[in-house]
C-alpha cells in the first residue's frame, strides 16, 4: 500500500503560524489593556496564545480549516473588544471620567453607588479605590474566561445533544451499507470498504486525501437524507396501521365481552382458512385481537400501569437479545410494548369474566355449558393472538433446512397439542367450584406468562405448527360433538395431557449453576481470523444462506438448553451450548458487517452439531413426557377408574401418535442394547477361553482343584453368596448386568466382604477377575480375584467341597452347570419374595457408586504421588538428603509446610516454579502445569505441593508397619551400610533351595503378598499379571537368580550402597551417626 498522503496543513511555514499567533496576541493584549491588566497578565496571555494556536493546528485536518478557525476566533474577540471599548468611551464622555475609571464604576453599579459617590470615595480613601480597581480587573478577566468556556460548552453541547431518533440515525449510519452508486463518488476507496465506520477508520489512519474527505462528506449527507426519508415513510405506514387498529378498539366496557365471545362455529374452520393467510389478513379476520388500550385507566391502577410498562420494556429487551444481535427499530419496539400491555389487559378481563362465570355456574346450573365454552374461546384467541403478534414482529428468521424442518414441525405440533389439551381440561375444571376455579385461573395465567416469554423467541418456529394443531384439534372436537347424540347428559371429560416442560421449577442451585455457566461462557476469549479475502463470492453467499437458515435452530437450542439441564443436570452439555452461542453470535455479527471469520465447512459442522443437540434435547423432552403421562394414567386409574375410558376418547389420535413414536424409539434402543450385550458376551467368552488355555498351560496342577470348586459351586445344596460365584466356569452372568438380581447397596460395604478382600490370595490360582471398586487401588492394571472372598486355594479345594453346606437357599440355584447362564433361564430365577422382577443396569451400577468414587479418588491419589516425586527429583536433584527426607515425610503424613530442607533452593528455580520471574512460561509449560494434578509452589525455602482435587484433606501417609518393613531384618549391632546391601541381595535369600538352587518350592514363591493389603496396592503387584506371559524359573522370571555371583557382580552390588567409596571407608561409616550423613551430602 502506498504511503500516507501529506496533509496540506503541513505546508504552512513557521512564519505564517507566527503571524497568526501575533494577531491573536494583539487582540488579547488590547483586551488586557482595556481591563487594566498588569505585565504579569501580559506574560500569561502570550503563553496562552501560543498554546491555543498549537492546539488549533493539531485539531484541524486541513489548512483551510485551520485558517478559517483562527480568523473566526480573532474576529470574534476583536468584535468583543470593540463593543466594550465603545461602551466605555460613551460612558466616559457622558460623565467626564476616564474610560478605565468609568468601566470600573459600571462594574460596581450592583452595589448601589452612583458616580458622584464613587468620586467622593476616591477622594476620601485612595487605598479603598485601588482595591476596588484591582477587584474590578479580576472580575472582568473572570467574565472573559467564563464567556470563552460557555462558548466552547455550547458548541460541544450542540454537537452532543442529539435526540434519541437522531442518535439512532447516527448509529444506523455507522453500520448501514453504502449504496454502490454513492460509493463510486468517493475516489480511492478500497473494494472491501462499504460502511461509514470503515471509512472513518481509514480517515483516522490518514489514508484519505482532503479531496476524498470532501467527497465523503457530501456522500454522507446524501446517504443520511435517504435513510431519513426511508424511516419517515416507515413511521408513517406504521402510524397509519396503528390508527386502523385503534379504530377497531372497543368504545365501552360492555363491548369487551361481546368481542371476546367469538362463536365456536367460527373457530371450527378448515385448516387452510387460517394457515395460508398472512398476519395482516388474520388481524382483519374473525381472529382480530380486541384493543383495550383506550380503557387502560379503568383496568389497571397507576402503580400497576407503571410496573406493567417496566415489565413490557424488559420483555422487549430480552426479545431483542434472543435475536442474536439483530436490532429492533423504535416503532417496532413501541408496537411490541403496546401489544404486550394489551395482552395483559385482556388476561385480566378474562380472569374477571372467569370468576363471574363461575359464580353464575354455582347459582344456575343451566349456565354450565356457557361457562365451559367462554374460557376455551378466550384461550384459543390468545394463542392465535400470540401467533399473529410474533409473526408481525419477528420477521427476520427464515425456514430451516428441509431435513431438520420435518423434525421440528413434528415436535412443535406435539408440544402445541399438549398445551391446547391442557388448557381445555383446565377450563372445564374451572366450572366445578369457585375456589378451585380461582386457583386454576392463577396457575393458567402463570403458565401463559412463562409460555409467552418462551414463545417470543420461538414464535416463527411454532407458528405454522400451532395453526395446524389448532385446526386438527378443532376438527376432532367437531367430530366428537357430532358423534355424541346427547352432549348435555354425557359431558365431555378431556384428559389432561402432561406438558413435558410443566413442573420444571428450577431450584436455587440450578439458577446459580446456569448463571455461573453463562457468565463463564461470556468470558470466553474468541480468536477469530478474518478469511474474507480467501473466500469466493459463491462461498460467501452460501455461508450467508446457511447461517440465515440455521438462525431458528440456534435460537431454539439456546432457549431450551436451560430447561433440559433442569431435567438431566448435565453441566457439560449446557456449558457447550453457551459457548457455542457466543461463537455463533460473533459469527453472525461479523457476517452482518460483511466480514467472514469461518469457512463453509465450519458452518456445515456447526449446523450438524446444533441438529444433534436439538435431537438429543427432543429425546429428553419426549422421555419426560412419557413419564408424566404414565404418572397421570396411574393417578387417574387410582382416583377414578370408572371414567378412564371416557377420558381417553378425546385424545386417542394424539396418544396413538405419541405412543408409536415412543415405541419406535424404545425398539431402536432395545436393538442397540441387545447388539451391545451380544458383542460383550462374545468378547467375554473369547477372553475366558484364552485365559483358560493360558491357565492350563502355566498351572496344569491347579486344574483339579478348580474343577472340584466348579462342581462344588454347582451343587444344589451348596450355599455360596451371590458375590462369591466368580470361578473360572461361572463368570458370564456378572457381565450381563440386565439379567442379574438386584444387589443390595449394603452388600458392597459389609464387614465380611472387606475381611475376605483383605485375606490372602493364592497367586497360582488362575481365575477370571473384575475390578472390585471397594478396594483402594492406585494402579489401573490391578485386579483382585473375585473368588478371594470365599474361594479356597487349590490345595484346600477338596476339603472345602467336603464341608457341610449351609441350609439357606442360594439365589443362583437355577444356574447351568457350564456356568454360562441362558438369558431365558435367567428370567425364571425366583427371588425369596416370589417372582423376581427385572432390573436394569442403572440399578446395579448404583450399588457400586460408593466404590467407584473411592476407586476414582485413589487413582487420582496415585497420579498425585507420582507427580510429587517427579517434582522432588527435579528440584532436589543436587540434594539426595532432601529428596529422601521429603519422601519419607510423605509416608509419615507430615505436611509440606512443616518439612525443612537442608539446602537452599536457587532463586531461579523459585521464580520458575512460582511464576514470579521476568520470563513468562511458554504455552507448552503452561499447558503441562494446567494438566498437572497438583499445584506446586516454593514458600520460605519449602516445597509445597497441594492437590487440585482435595486441597485440605489429602494425605499420602502409609501405615508405620509398612515403613518398618523396609528395615526388616536390620537390628542389633548393625552399623555398616554394605551389610544392608548384601543382605537384601536376592542371591543370599533364605528362600533358595540349597540342593537345587535353580528350582524353588511353590510355597516360597510369594507371588501374592501375604502381609497386608497395602502391598497389593504397591507398584510391584503387577508381577502376577506379568508372570502369565513367562514360565516359572525362566531367565525372564524376576524371582529367579543365578546360583552364584561373580566377584565383579558382588562389587557392583556393593557399590550400590550410598556414600561408600571403598571397603575401608565402609567399615568407618556408622549409619547411626548423623554427622556422617550430613557430611556425605
Swiss-Prot record:
Residues 422-481 are annotated as: 30 X 2 AA approximate tandem repeats of Q-A. One of its GO terms (molecular function) is transcription coactivator activity. GO terms for cellular component: core mediator complex; mediator complex; nucleus. It comes from the Eukaryota. The modification Phosphoserine is found at residues 335, 736, 752, 783, 785, 789, 831, 1003, 1008, 1018, 1034. Residues 476-497 have a biased composition (Low complexity). Residues 25-49 are annotated as: Interaction with GCN4. Disulfide bonds: none annotated. The modification N-acetylserine is found at residue 2. Residues 749-836 have a biased composition (Polar residues). InterPro entries: Gal11_coact (IPR033789), KIX_dom_sf (IPR036529), MED15_KIX (IPR036546), Mediator_Med15_fun (IPR008626). The modification Phosphothreonine is found at residue 793. Sequence repeats lie at residues 422-423, 424-425, 426-427, 428-429, 430-431, 432-433, 434-435, 436-437, 438-439, 440-441, 442-443, 444-445, 446-447, 448-449, 450-451, 452-453, 454-455, 456-457, 458-459, 460-461, 462-463, 464-465, 466-467, 468-469, 470-471, 472-473, 474-475, 476-477, 478-479, 480-481. The keyword Lipoprotein does not apply. GO terms for biological process: cellular response to heat; negative regulation of transcription by RNA polymerase II; positive regulation of invasive growth in response to glucose limitation; positive regulation of transcription by RNA polymerase II; positive regulation of transcription elongation by RNA polymerase II; positive regulation of transcription initiation by RNA polymerase II; regulation of establishment of protein localization to chromosome; RNA polymerase II preinitiation complex assembly. Disruption phenotype: Sensitive to amino acid starvation. Normal GCN4 protein level during amino acid starvation. Keywords: Acetylation, Activator, Nucleus, Phosphoprotein, Repeat, Transcription, Transcription regulation. It is found in: Nucleus. Component of the Mediator complex, a coactivator involved in the regulated transcription of nearly all RNA polymerase II-dependent genes. Mediator functions as a bridge to convey information from gene-specific regulatory proteins to the basal RNA polymerase II transcription machinery. The Mediator complex, having a compact conformation in its free form, is recruited to promoters by direct interactions with regulatory proteins and serves for the assembly of a functional pre-initiation complex with RNA polymerase II and the general transcription factors. Present with 606 molecules/cell in log phase SD medium. Belongs to the Mediator complex subunit 15 family. Component of the Mediator complex, which is composed of at least 21 subunits that form three structurally distinct submodules. The Mediator head module contains MED6, MED8, MED11, SRB4/MED17, SRB5/MED18, ROX3/MED19, SRB2/MED20 and SRB6/MED22, the middle module contains MED1, MED4, NUT1/MED5, MED7, CSE2/MED9, NUT2/MED10, SRB7/MED21 and SOH1/MED31, and the tail module contains MED2, PGD1/MED3, RGR1/MED14, GAL11/MED15 and SIN4/MED16. The head and the middle modules interact directly with RNA polymerase II, whereas the elongated tail module interacts with gene-specific regulatory proteins. This is Mediator of RNA polymerase II transcription subunit 15. It comes from Saccharomyces cerevisiae (strain ATCC 204508 / S288c) (Baker's yeast). The gene is GAL11.
Amino acid at each position: 500500500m502506498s504511503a500516507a498522503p501529506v496533509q496540506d496543513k503541513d505546508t504552512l511555514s513557521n512564519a505564517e503560524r507566527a503571524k497568526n499567533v501575533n494577531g491573536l496576541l494583539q487582540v488579547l493584549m488590547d483586551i488586557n489593556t482595556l481591563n487594566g491588566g498588569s505585565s504579569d497578565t501580559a506574560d500569561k496571555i502570550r503563553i496562552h496564545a501560543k498554546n491555543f494556536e498549537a492546539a488549533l493546528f493539531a485539531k484541524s485536518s486541513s489548512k483551510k480549516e485551520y485558517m478559517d478557525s483562527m480568523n473566526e476566533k480573532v474576529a470574534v474577540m476583536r468584535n468583543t473588544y470593540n463593543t466594550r471599548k465603545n461602551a466605555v468611551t460613551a460612558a466616559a464622555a457622558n460623565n467626564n471620567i476616564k474610560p478605565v475609571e468609568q468601566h470600573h464604576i459600571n462594574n460596581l453599579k450592583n452595589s448601589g453607588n452612583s458616580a458622584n459617590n464613587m468620586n467622593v470615595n476616591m477622594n476620601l480613601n485612595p487605598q479603598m479605590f485601588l482595591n476596588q480597581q484591582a477587584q474590578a480587573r479580576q472580575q472582568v478577566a473572570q467574565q472573559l474566561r467564563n464567556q470563552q468556556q460557555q462558548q466552547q460548552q455550547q458548541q460541544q453541547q450542540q454537537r452532543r445533544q442529539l435526540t434519541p431518533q437522531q442518535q439512532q440515525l447516527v448509529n444506523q449510519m455507522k453500520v448501514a451499507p453504502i449504496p454502490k452508486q454513492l460509493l463510486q463518488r468517493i475516489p480511492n476507496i478500497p473494494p472491501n470498504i462499504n460502511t461509514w465506520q470503515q471509512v472513518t477508520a481509514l480517515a483516522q489512519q490518514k489514508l484519505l486525501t482532503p479531496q476524498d474527505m470532501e467527497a465523503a462528506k457530501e456522500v454522507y449527507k446524501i446517504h443520511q437524507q435517504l435513510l431519513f426519508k426511508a424511516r419517515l415513510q416507515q413511521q408513517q405506514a406504521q402510524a397509519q396501521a396503528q390508527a386502523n387498529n385503534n379504530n377497531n378498539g372497543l368504545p365501552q366496557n360492555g363491548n369487551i365481552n361481546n368481542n371476546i365471545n367469538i362463536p365456536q362455529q367460527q373457530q371450527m374452520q378448515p385448516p387452510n382458512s387460517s394457515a395460508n393467510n398472512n398476519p395482516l389478513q388474520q388481524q382483519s379476520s374473525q381472529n382480530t385481537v380486541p384493543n383495550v388500550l383506550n380503557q387502560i385507566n379503568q383496568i389497571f391502577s397507576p402503580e400497576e400501569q407503571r410496573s406493567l410498562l417496566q415489565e413490557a420494556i424488559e420483555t422487549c429487551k430480552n426479545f431483542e437479545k434472543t435475536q442474536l444481535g439483530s436490532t429492533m427499530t423504535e416503532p417496532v419496539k413501541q408496537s411490541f410494548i403496546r401489544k404486550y400491555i394489551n395482552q395483559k389487559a385482556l388476561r385480566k378481563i378474562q380472569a374477571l369474566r372467569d370468576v363471574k362465570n363461575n359464580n353464575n355456574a354455582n347459582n344456575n346450573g343451566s349456565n354450565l355449558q356457557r361457562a365451559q365454552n367462554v374460557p376455551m374461546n378466550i384461550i384459543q384467541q390468545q394463542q392465535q393472538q400470540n401467533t399473529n403478534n410474533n409473526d408481525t414482529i419477528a420477521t427476520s428468521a427464515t425456514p430451516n433446512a428441509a431435513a431438520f424442518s420435518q423434525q421440528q414441525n413434528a415436535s412443535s405440533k406435539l408440544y402445541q397439542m399438549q398445551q391446547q389439551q391442557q388448557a381445555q381440561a383446565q377450563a372445564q375444571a374451572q366450572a366445578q367450584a369457585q375456589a378451585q376455579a380461582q386457583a386454576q385461573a392463577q396457575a393458567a395465567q402463570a403458565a401463559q406468562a412463562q409460555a409467552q416469554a418462551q414463545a417470543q423467541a420461538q414464535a416463527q418456529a411454532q407458528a405454522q405448527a400451532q395453526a395446524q394443531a389448532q385446526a386438527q384439534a378443532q376438527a376432532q372436537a367437531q367430530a366428537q360433538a357430532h358423534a355424541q347424540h346427547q352432549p348435555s347428559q354425557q359431558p365431555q371429560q378431556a384428559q389432561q395431557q402432561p406438558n413435558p416442560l410443566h413442573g420444571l421449577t428450577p431450584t436455587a442451585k440450578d439458577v446459580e449453576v446456569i448463571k455461573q455457566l453463562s457468565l463463564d461462557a461470556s468470558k470466553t476469549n474468541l480468536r477469530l481470523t478474518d478469511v474474507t479475502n480467501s473466500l469466493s463470492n459463491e462461498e460467501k453467499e452460501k455461508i450467508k444462506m446457511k447461517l440465515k437458515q440455521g438462525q431458528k435452530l440456534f435460537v431454539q437450542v439456546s432457549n431450551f438448553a436451560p430447561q433440559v439441564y433442569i431435567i438431566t443436570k448435565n453441566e457439560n452439555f449446557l456449558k457447550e451450548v453457551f459457548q457455542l452461542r457466543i461463537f455463533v453470535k460473533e459469527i453472525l455479527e461479523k457476517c452482518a458487517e460483511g466480514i467472514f471469520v469461518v469457512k463453509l465447512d465450519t458452518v456445515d459442522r456447526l449446523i450438524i452439531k446444533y441438529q444433534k443437540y436439538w435431537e438429543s434435547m427432543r429425546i429428553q423432552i419426549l422421555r419426560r413426557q412419557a413419564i408424566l403421562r404414565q404418572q397421570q394414567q396411574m393417578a387417574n386409574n387410582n382416583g377414578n377408574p370408572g371414567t378412564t375410558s371416557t377420558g381417553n376418547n378425546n385424545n386417542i389420535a394424539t396418544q396413538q401418535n405419541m405412543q408409536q413414536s415412543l415405541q419406535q424409539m424404545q425398539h431402536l434402543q432395545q436393538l442397540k442394547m441387545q447388539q451391545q450385550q451380544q458383542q460383550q458376551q462374545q468378547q467375554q467368552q473369547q477372553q475366558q477361553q484364552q485365559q483358560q488355555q493360558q491357565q492350563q498351560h502355566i498351572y496344569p496342577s491347579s486344574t483339579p482343584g478348580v474343577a472340584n470348586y466348579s462342581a462344588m459351586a454347582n451343587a444344589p445344596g451348596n450355599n455360596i453368596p451371590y458375590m462369591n460365584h466368580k470361578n473360572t466356569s461361572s463368570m458370564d452372568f456378572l457381565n450381563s448386568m440386565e439379567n442379574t438380581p438386584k444387589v443390595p447397596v449394603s452388600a458392597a460395604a459389609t464387614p465380611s466382604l472387606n475381611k475376605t478382600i483383605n485375606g490372602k490370595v493364592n497367586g497360582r490360582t488362575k481365575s477370571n477377575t473384575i475390578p472390585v471398586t471397594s478396594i483402594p487401588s492406585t494402579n489401573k492394571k490391578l485386579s483382585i480375584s473375585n473368588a478371594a472372598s470365599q474361594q479356597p486355594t487349590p490345595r484346600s479345594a477338596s476339603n472345602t467341597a467336603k464341608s457341610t453346606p449351609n441350609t439357606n437357599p442360594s439365589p443362583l440355584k437355577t444356574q447351568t452347570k457350564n456356568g454360562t447362564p441362558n438369558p431365558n433361564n435367567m428370567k425364571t430365577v425366583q427371588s425369596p419374595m416370589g417372582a423376581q422382577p427385572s432390573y436394569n443396569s442403572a440399578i446395579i451400577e448404583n450399588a457400586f457408586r460408593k466404590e467407584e468414587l473411592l476407586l476414582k479418588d485413589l487413582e487420582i491419589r496415585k497420579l498425585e504421588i507420582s507427580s510429587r516425586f517427579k517434582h522432588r527429583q527435579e528440584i532436589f536433584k543436587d540434594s539426595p538428603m532432601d529428596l529422601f527426607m521429603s519422601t519419607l515425610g510423605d509416608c509419615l503424613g507430615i505436611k509440606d509446610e512443616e518439612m525443612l530442607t537442608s539446602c537452599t533452593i536457587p532463586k531461579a528455580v523459585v521464580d520458575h516454579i512460582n511464576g514470579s520471574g521476568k520470563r513468562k512460561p511458554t504455552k507448552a509449560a503452561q499447558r503441562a502445569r494446567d494438566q498437572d494434578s497438583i499445584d506446586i509452589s516454593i514458600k520460605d525455602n519449602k516445597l509445597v505441593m497441594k492437590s487440585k482435587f482435595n486441597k485440605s484433606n489429602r494425605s499420602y501417609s502409609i501405615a508405620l508397619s509398612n515403613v518398618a518393613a523396609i528395615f526388616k531384618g536390620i537390628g542389633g549391632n548393625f552399623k555398616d551400610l554394605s551389610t544392608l546391601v548384601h543382605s537384601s541381595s536376592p542371591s543370599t535369600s533364605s528362600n533358595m533351595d540349597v540342593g537345587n538352587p535353580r528350582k524353588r518350592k511353590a510355597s516360597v514363591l510369594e507371588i501374592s503378598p501375604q502381609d497386608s493389603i497395602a502391598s497389593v496396592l504397591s507398584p510391584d503387584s503387577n508381577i502376577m499379571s506379568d508372570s502369565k506371559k513367562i514360565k516359572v524359573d525362566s531367565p525372564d522370571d524376576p524371582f529367579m537368580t543365578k546360583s552364584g555371583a561373580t566377584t565383579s557382580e558382588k562389587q557392583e552390588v556393593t557399590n550400590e550402597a550410598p556414600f561408600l567409596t571403598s571397603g575401608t571407608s565402609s567399615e568407618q561409616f556408622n549409619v547411626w551417626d548423623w554427622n556422617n550423613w550430613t557430611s556425605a551430602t
